[in-house]
UniProtKB/Swiss-Prot annotation:
It comes from Dictyostelium discoideum (Social amoeba). Heme binds at C470. Belongs to the cytochrome P450 family. One of its GO terms (cellular component) is membrane. Its EC number is 1.14.-.-. The chain crosses the membrane at residues 1-21. This is Probable cytochrome P450 519C1. SUPFAM superfamilies: Cytochrome P450 (SSF48264). PROSITE patterns: CYTOCHROME_P450. It is found in: Membrane. Keywords: Heme, Iron, Membrane, Metal-binding, Monooxygenase, Oxidoreductase, Transmembrane, Transmembrane helix. CDD domains: CYP1_2-like. GO terms for molecular function: heme binding; iron ion binding; monooxygenase activity; oxidoreductase activity, acting on paired donors, with incorporation or reduction of molecular oxygen. PANTHER family: CYTOCHROME P450 307A1-RELATED, HEME-BINDING MONOOXYGENASE FAMILY.
Length: 524
C-alpha cells in the first residue's frame, strides 16, 4: 500500500513539474501557446490536419510562436522573412535534423541525405547528388528515363480508355513515381529489368513489391508516432518500430541485390548514374571502412533519395488531376496550349507525345502545376530542423535543441489573395508584374504594408528554401510536366460519375487526396 501511495505521489509531482515547465514564460523567448498540458503539451491542438490548425493559430499568435509537442519544444515559423532568416541567413544554426525514434529506426541512425546532421559528410553527399544531376550525360539519361516511363504510363491509360475501365490514380502514379526514381538511381540495371507500368504486372512485378513496403514506411512515418514526442510511451510502441524496420529492410534487400550487380560493372572513369557516384565517393573517401560498411552507407544514401523523391511527386500528380477534373475550362486551356506548341508536328499518324524540350513553351501548364503546389503543398510543414546552438531570431531567444517547423502551407495561404481559390492566372499576373518592374528598373512595391504579400516566389516554397532545400527540384519539375502534359494531350479526364471530386486531404509524409478513379476519354 505504501508503495502504491509513493507511486501516486511521484506521478502527481511529475505532472505538476511538467505542467510548470511547459507553461513557464521567459521574457525573450518565442511566444508560447497557453495551456500546455502535462505529458502531451499542445498535441491536443493539432487535430487531424496539423498544418491547417497551426495556420489558424497564426492569426492569434503571429508568424512565429512555440508550443510543446509532447516532450519536444517546437517553434512554428509562418512569417516568410523569419523563415528566410532561419533557412538561409542563419542556416548553420538550424541545419540539423531532430533525432525522432521512428526516423532513427527507419534510417539506421540517420545516415542518409534527408535525416543526416549537417556535419562534414552532409555537404559532400549533397554535392554528389546535385553535381550528378547537373552533368550533361546524366541529365540526358534522366530525361530519357522520365520520357520512357511517361510513354508507358500513357499507353496503360490508353488501354483503360479503350475498354472504358476506371483509372486508379493513386496506384498508377505511385508506381510511375518509384519507377522514375529507381531509373535515375541505377539506370542500366533498370533498363535490363524493364520497369513497366502495364496492366498485366501492376500488382505482381518487382517494382510493385518494392512500392508496397515504401508506402508502408510512408504510412507509419506520416501518420505520426506519438511515442516520438512522448518518451515514456516508447516501450508500448515496440511493435510499430518493428513494422517500420521490417518495411525498411525489404527496401534495403531490394537495393542490395541491385548494388551487388551494379558493383560488378562499375567504371570509375564512366559513372552511369547516381549509384555510381555514391560508390565512387565511398571507395575514394572511406579507406578505413570495411566493404560491408561501404555497402550499407551507399544503400542508405540511395534509400534516402528514393524516399525523398517518391511520395511528393505521386501526391502532386493526384492533386493536379483532381483540380483539372474539377476545373474543365482550365483543363481545356492547357490542352489548347499544348496543341499550339506542337503545331504541325502533331498529326493523327503519330502517337501523341510532347517531349521535355517543349516545357519552356508551355507556361500556362507550368503555372497550373505551380498553383497546385501552392494550394496543396505536398510537405505542408516541411522536414523538421533543430537549433544547433542558442541563438536569436527577430529579437526572440531560441534555445539549443529546439525543433523548428517551417509552415509552408501557412505561408502560401496567409500571404496571398483568395488562398483557397484554385487560380493559375495569379501566377501569370505575378510574372507579368515582375517583368514590368524589371523593365522599369523598379523595386517591388510593398502590398498591404507587407512586402511578401502576393510575392508568390517568396511565399510558395513547396520544396523548401536555402542550402538544405530539396536537391531533386529539377527532376520533380520535369516529372510533373511530362506526365501532366501528356495526360492532357491524350485524354479528357473526368470523374467516374461526372460530379466534382472531393478535395479532402489524407495526411501522411505527403498530403494526398482521398483515392479516386479517373474516367479517360481519348482525344483521338
Amino acid at each position: 500500500m505504501n508503495i502504491l501511495l509513493l507511486i501516486f505521489y511521484f506521478l502527481v509531482c511529475f505532472l505538476i513539474f511538467d505542467f510548470i515547465k511547459k507553461n513557464k514564460v521567459k521574457k525573450y523567448d518565442v511566444p508560447t501557446l497557453s495551456y500546455a498540458l502535462p505529458i502531451i503539451g499542445h498535441l491536443y491542438k493539432l487535430g487531424v490536419n496539423p498544418h491547417r490548425n497551426l495556420t489558424k493559430l497564426v492569426e492569434k499568435n503571429g508568424g512565429i510562436f512555440s508550443l510543446w509537442l509532447g516532450d519536444i519544444k517546437t517553434v512554428i515559423v509562418t512569417d516568410p522573412s523569419i523563415n528566410k532568416e532561419i533557412m538561409v541567413k542563419q542556416f548553420t544554426n538550424f541545419s540539423d535534423r531532430p533525432r525522432l525514434k521512428s526516423f532513427e529506426s527507419f534510417t539506421g541512425g540517420g545516415v542518409n541525405l534527408i535525416f543526416i546532421d549537417y556535419n562534414e559528410k552532409w555537404p559532400v553527399i549533397r554535392k554528389i547528388v546535385s553535381s550528378s544531376i547537373t552533368k550533361t550525360k546524366i541529365i540526358s539519361n534522366y530525361k530519357e528515363v522520365i520520357e520512357n516511363q511517361t510513354k508507358i504510363l500513357i499507353n496503360s491509360m490508353r488501354t483503360h480508355s479503350k475498354i472504358n475501365e476506371p483509372f486508379k490514380s493513386k496506384k498508377y502514379f505511385g508506381k510511375f513515381s518509384i519507377s522514375i526514381v529507381l531509373g535515375i538511381m541505377f539506370k542500366q540495371d533498370n533498363d535490363e529489368k524493364q520497369i513497366n507500368i502495364n496492366d498485366n504486372n501492376i500488382d505482381n512485378d518487382p517494382i510493385t513489391k518494392l512500392t508496397e513496403p515504401i508506402q508502408q514506411v510512408f504510412l507509419l512515418l506520416g501518420t505520426g508516432n506519438i511515442s516520438d514526442f512522448i518518451k515514456i510511451l516508447r516501450p508500448f510502441f515496440k511493435n510499430e518500430y518493428k513494422k517500420l524496420n521490417n518495411s525498411a529492410s525489404k527496401v534495403f534487400k531490394f537495393m542490395e541485390e541491385i548494388y551487388d550487380q551494379h558493383l560488378l560493372k562499375f567504371d570509375k572513369s564512366n559513372p552511369r548514374d547516381l549509384m555510381d557516384y555514391f560508390i565512387e565517393y565511398e571507395f575514394t573517401n572511406s579507406p578505413n571502412t570495411t566493404l560491408e560498411e561501404k555497402k550499407i552507407s551507399i544503400i542508405k544514401g540511395c534509400m534516402s533519395f528514393v524516399f525523398a523523391g517518391d511520395d511528393t511527386v505521386a501526391a502532386t500528380l493526384e492533386w493536379v488531376c483532381l483540380y483539372l477534373i474539377n476545373n474543365p475550362a482550365i483543363q481545356e486551356k492547357c490542352y489548347n496550349e499544348l496543341i499550339s506548341v506542337l503545331g504541325d508536328n502533331n498529326n493523327e499518324s503519330k502517337i501523341k507525345f510532347i517531349s521535355l524540350k517543349e516545357r519552356d513553351n508551355c507556361q500556362y501548364l507550368i503555372n497550373v502545376i505551380k498553383e497546385v503546389l501552392r494550394i496543396r503543398t505536398p510537405l505542408p510543414l516541411s522536414v523538421p530542423r533543430i537549433a544547433t546552438q542558442n541563438c536569436e531570431i527577430n529579437g526572440f531567444f531560441i534555445e539549443k535543441g529546439t525543433q523548428i517547423l517551417s509552415n509552408a502551407f501557412g505561408m502560401s495561404h496567409l500571404y496571398v489573395d483568395e488562398p483557397n481559390v484554385f487560380n493559375p492566372d495569379r501566377w501569370i499576373n505575378y510574372y507579368n508584374q515582375k517583368q514590368q518592374q524589371q523593365q522599369q528598373q523598379q523595386q517591388p512595391q510593398p502590398i498591404q504594408n507587407n512586402n511578401y504579400f502576393n510575392d508568390l516566389d517568396r511565399v510558395c516554397l513547396p520544396f523548401s528554401t536555402g542550402p538544405r532545400n530539396c536537391v531533386g527540384i529539377s527532376i520533380a519539375e520535369l516529372n510533373l510536366f511530362s506526365v501532366c502534359a501528356n495526360i492532357i494531350l491524350n485524354f479528357q479526364i473526368k470523374s467516374i460519375d461526372g460530379m466534382q471530386l472531393k478535395d479532402i486531404e489524407v495526411s501522411g509524409i505527403s498530403i494526398h487526396p482521398i483515392p479516386f478513379s479517373i474516367k479517360l476519354i481519348s482525344r483521338n
